């Protein structure tokens, strides 16, 4: 069994990518060439539960599809960053803005 040497109770925010994290690593394509992103219902429930318990949540993805925005905003996540090819500065700014 592994050991974690930090206090998980101090975690106040979570940042997630979509592709391969909140969706399968394989992305089917529509005939138009647009990616079809499939999401797991259980992930959505877990994200809503985390919000309910006061965690700050951000979605940070290089993809830029309306369906991704609609899905995560529909779960109550207000910080959805689409088209983020360079993610670190966006995440750092989000952390500063949220006191994390």
Where are these regions (language model features)?
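Substrate-recognition element of Asp-dependent hydrolases with the DxDx(T/V) motif
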Residues: 47-71, 81-82
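A positional/architectural concept
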Residues: 22-53
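C-terminal cap/substrate-recognition subdomain and adjoining C-terminal extension
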Residues: 13, 68-100
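Short, compositionally biased "basic patch" segments
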Residues: 9-22, 62-65
């Amino acid at each position: 069994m592994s050991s974690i040497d930090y206090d998980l109770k101090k975690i106040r925010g979570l940042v997630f990518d979509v592709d391969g994290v909140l969706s399968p690593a394989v992305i089917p394509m529509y005939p138009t060439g647009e990616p079809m992103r499939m999401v797991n219902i259980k992930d959505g429930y877990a994200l809503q539960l985390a919000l309910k318990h006061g965690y700050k949540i951000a979605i940070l993805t290089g993809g830029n599809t309306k369906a991704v925005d609609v899905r995560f905003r529909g779960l109550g996540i207000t910080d959805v960053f689409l088209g983020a090819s360079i993610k670190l500065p966006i995440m750092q700014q989000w952390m500063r803005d949220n006191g994390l």
